[in-house]
Amino acid sequence: MISGPDRSLFAYALVTAAYWAFMLTDGALRMLVLLYFHINGFDPISLAFLFLLYEFMGMVTNLGAGWIAARYGLNLTLYAGLVLQVGTLALLAVANPTTVGLASVLLVMGLQGLAGAAKDLTKMSAKSAVKVLVPEGEAGESRLLRWVARLTGSKNAIKGLGFFVGAGLLQTIGFSAGLWVLAGGLALILLGALALMPAGLSGRKRAALPFSTIFSTSSALNRLSLARVFLFGARDVWFVVGVPLFFYAQGWTFAAVGAFMAVWVMGYGVVQGATPNLLAIRTGAIGRSVRALRVWGAMLVMILLALSATVLSLQVDGLTAVVAGGLILFGGAFAINSTLHSFLVLAYAEAEDVTLDVGFYYMSNAAGRLLGALLSGVIFQTFGGVAGKSGLLACLLVATLFCALAWLVSIRLPQTSTKVEAR
């Protein structure tokens, strides 16, 4: 029988493994859908629309899932996310639409919506589980920061690997067969989690909980959530459609695009995992994290301004290396900002309300991704220009504006833990 700290560590390891497996399929599915439907004639706006319901369902799911987990436990939402993803992969493999048209777009949008719901069920459960498993107090704050950084960083490294896996599956065995491989592997992980997960992960269930409690009453969480909307909107407005299609327009193969995006996300994940050590945060984690967020938020704005000016001044032939290098610099600074956000939401949240607070916060995260995904396709197609230069520049300028707004909101975050008003 596993008990005490060993039990918490074992539960954390199982949750992390399930989350890793899910994010591998999530990254692979994103690259499979993006590249497969691009070669089947979908234009940038159509591709962006394929991901809209994915992000919208993430918003809806986070709100509802936080309430469900508070009522019935984290185990239920974790397993539901894994089951839903297996089903989505299988359904998309069977459907396998290849023609451009309203029916195909709606079908893939619907299935992507299921994938979005699955992703946020799993993510909310995994992130909330860390708060449940880590003890309170200043030592707990430091441990919470380390565990959040490792979970978030490793998740993104695995998702980056998923990009590579998705591109590789498309190039080797094709769209449908690749989806079946992903569905089968995730089903095995689900069975392992069901068999091995220790009791008690769910935390304290609350029977009498009005649905209105899904909305946060904490000014700190509301500010952080608004900053998250702009932060992730800034990333996805050029990352979702603009960057992959820009590289493809420069003659890159599917495998090359997938490999670069994979390495970028994996490196981004490594930086996230190393953030507590990079910033040397040991004690006073909340205050030091807020101060670091002010510095690194400004750094993001400066990187994007410099990259935008460089893209504007160069010809298309010299842009590929510049965009790749700029994306790497942006990824490092963004990873630090994102990790600090992920820690602060759990630090500000009350243990008994963690699923509600995390659900509300990641609803904002999904809203930012939704906004960014939509604008990425619309802006890139509207301003595309020669080989996508003007479209990419327009995406970068919007990303700069969003990062500036995220920074402005973040500078007013409190430097101590705040109690959430009674729900």
Which residue stretches match the model-derived regions?
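Helix-loop boundary and gating motifs at the non-cytosolic
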Residues: 2-56, 220-264
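Hydrophobic core of transmembrane alpha-helices in multi-pass small-molecule transporters
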Residues: 20, 88, 101-122, 320-337
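Central cavity-lining transmembrane alpha-helices of secondary-active solute carriers
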Residues: 49-67, 262-275
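C-terminal ends and interior cores of transmembrane alpha-helices
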Residues: 83-101, 299-316
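Cytoplasmic helix-loop-helix junction between adjacent transmembrane helices
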Residues: 111-155
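A membrane-interface helix-boundary motif in multi-pass transporters
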Residues: 170-185, 318, 378-404
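Multi-pass alpha-helical transporter architecture, strongest
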Residues: 186-198, 307-312, 395-423
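C-terminal transmembrane helical hairpin of 12-TM major facilitator-type secondary transporters
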Residues: 289-341
